[in-house]
């Protein structure tokens, strides 16, 4: 099994996967677009499973910050298979870098928050993550605390939704989209922006680092599919195909 990757911009391009036969002739099995992100997104336990229709793989891990199972399309397939043939059955707690290819997106204005509110919000998020971890281990008090917290949140939203817009109440979200398990609808704050040209088509590509539900990752989108002008501090809302790279 062999994979070839060709960059058409900054860490984005096309990967061709296939096999060589006995006469050393390459046979293409499938291709997919890729975008490689930066940094380490998560170091939770990762499980990798093969797709039924072809020799491609999906990774999954439970990150408590999200509240949902993070499922991504594995980018470095050849490297994973090489490690697998060496006897590594499970990648375990390998660092993972996830990134998103966005099919469409919008730029939203940020919510107005002071430094103290941001500090309190981060502390509450950290406490909630600890409660979820404890609840998974059977802690009944943690389960009760989470239930009460959800009820308070529901009550607050029910009151504010009468006068406020949903995107004014919700700062960010990360939730599954459609029937494909590795597609998500995300809303997050833009932390960094870089624009470049596709060297083949000349189209402008916008690459952004966003923070959604306390998780930072990079996304890539064709500028013509993006509504609004991106800027640091504003928010990105859109649909992404989540890809991931295991680090060995």
Indicate residue ranges for each PLM-predicted region.
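Short amphipathic beta-strand/extended segments with alternating polar/hydrophobic composition
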Residues: 72, 218-223
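Eukaryotic intrinsically disordered and solvent-exposed regulatory patches
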Residues: 175, 194-196, 224
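Short coil-to-beta-strand transition motifs
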Residues: 177-189, 234
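OB-fold (S1/OB) nucleic-acid-binding surfaces
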Residues: 191-219
């Amino acid at each position: 099994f062999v994979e070839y990757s060709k960059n058409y911009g900054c860490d984005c391009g096309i990967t061709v996967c296939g096999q060589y036969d006995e006469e050393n002739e390459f046979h293409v099995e499938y291709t997919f677009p890729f975008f490689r992100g930066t940094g380490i997104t998560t170091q939770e336990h990762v499980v990798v499973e093969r797709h039924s229709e072809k020799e491609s793989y999906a990774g999954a891990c439970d990150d408590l910050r999200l509240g949902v199972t993070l499922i991504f399309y594995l980018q470095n397939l050849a490297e994973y298979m090489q490690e697998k043939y060496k006897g590594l059955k499970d990648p375990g707690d390998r660092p993972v870098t996830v990134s998103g290819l966005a099919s469409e997106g919008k730029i939203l204005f940020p919510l107005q928050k002071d430094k103290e509110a941001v500090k309190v919000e981060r502390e509450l998020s950290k406490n909630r993550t600890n409660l979820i971890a404890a609840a998974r281990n059977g802690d009944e008090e943690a389960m009760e605390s989470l239930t009460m917290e959800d009820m308070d949140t529901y009550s607050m939203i029910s009151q504010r939704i009468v006068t406020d817009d949903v995107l004014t109440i919700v700062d960010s979200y990360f939730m599954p989209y459609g029937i494909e398990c590795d597609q998500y609808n995300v809303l997050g704050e833009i932390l960094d922006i870089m624009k470049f040209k596709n060297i083949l088509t000349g189209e402008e590509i916008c690459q952004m680092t966003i923070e959604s539900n306390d998780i930072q990752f990079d996304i890539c989108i064709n500028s013509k599919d993006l509504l609004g002008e991106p800027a640091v501090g504003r928010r990105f809302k859109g649909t992404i195909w989540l890809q991931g790279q295991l680090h060995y």
